[in-house]
Every structure is written in structure tokens, then in C-alpha cells.
Amino acid sequence: FVSYIIMLILPGAFIWKLYDKAYNLTMENYINDSINFLSQAAAGFDKYIESLDERSVRLACDTNLKAMMKIRKPQPAESTVYNIVRFSNELYEKLSYIDKNMGYFVILGDNEFIFTENTVVYGLKYYFDNLRTYQSITYDEWYEQVFYTNNRILFPMRTIQINGKSVDAITYNYPIKGGNNWSTKGVVQFLIRREYLED
């Protein structure tokens, strides 16, 4: 009877050992594949951020942008209106090749102009309250995060209301320096939407 039980246990133990080894190999392969996938995704994201950095640096050094930062809010029919529209069109030509799901924004702090791919808006608070509202932060918090930075920063994924539509996005924020104290006078922003990250 004992030899019969041993005859049953030995093949069972052998099969269990094979199963355990196969399971461990499968898990190891799965973990390695996952690490490789995540490494490739991270490298791709880093490369994308580097391309945004390159575009932002070029734009921050643009002489037309520097001139635009000095313009005050124009009255209707002033010649300055033409300059603003022309600059908006130049921006569109420079940045229109960026994925349409991303969206670009050039936000000037002193004169409160906001250039987007669709329009030019005047008034930072108006823009925040009516056209691009971050649900989890106030206008003052947004202003501080946007303009009190010296380096490029990525704001965490947040729900943003853009023209009445909800979007989950990371905000890329690159400071435009100027003035005597070389402080942040404006920013270049891109919205990196959740859908882009999930693709």
C-alpha cells in the first residue's frame, strides 16, 4: 500500500515541479516583456517631451514673440490688431503640425494675451474662468503654477474644461523669460491628452 502511494506521489511531485518551473518562466518572461514595454513607452514619451522643449526654446527666442510681449491691449481698428492677427497666424504655421489632439497655448502675462490654434483671447482670468478651467485648482493657484516657474514643468493629469468640453490632460509648461530681472513673462503650453498617452 505504501509503495502504491509513493508511486502516486512521485509523478504528482514531478508534475508539480514542472508546472512550478513553467509558471516561473512564464512570469519572468511576462515581467521582462512588461519592463521592456514600459521602457520603450518612457523613452518615447521622453523623446516627445524633448521635441516640445526644442519647439518651445525656439519660440521663446522668437523676436516677433518678444515684440508681441510689449504690446498693450489695442482698441478696435488700431494697427496693432493687424500685428496681433499676423503673429497668431505665424504661430499657427509654426505649431500647426503638432497633433491636433494636443493643443498649443502661448500665454503672455504682462499684456494678458493668450494665443491658441483657434483664436486670440485677452484677459487671463476671463480665459481661465470661461475657456480653459482646471477643475481641481483656483485661478490664483493656476497663475502661480504657470508664471512662478523658472524651468519647464509638467503639471499632473487633471480634468480641464476647454470650451465646455471635459479633457483629461497633462499640461506642458515652458517659461518665456524677459524684462530686466529675467523673470517669466509668458509661457508656452501644450496639453498632452490622456488619449495620446494611452495610444
Question: Model-derived features: where do they sit?
Answer:
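Extracellular/periplasmic ligand-binding regions of membrane signal-transduction receptors
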Residues: 35, 50-86, 107-112, 119-128
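Juxtamembrane extracytoplasmic/periplasmic/luminal helical "stalk" adjacent to the first N-terminal
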Residues: 1-73
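Extracytoplasmic/periplasmic ligand-binding sensor regions of membrane-associated signaling proteins
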Residues: 96-97, 110-193, 197
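Soluble or luminal CAZymes and related metallo-dependent hydrolases
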Residues: 37, 79-87, 134, 138, ...
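Short regulatory alpha-helical segment in sensory/regulatory domains of signaling proteins that mediates
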Residues: 46, 60, 92-99, 147
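Short amphipathic alpha-helical segments
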Residues: 35, 39, 84-92, 198
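Amphipathic heptad-repeat coiled-coil/leucine-zipper-like oligomerization helices
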Residues: 98, 104-105
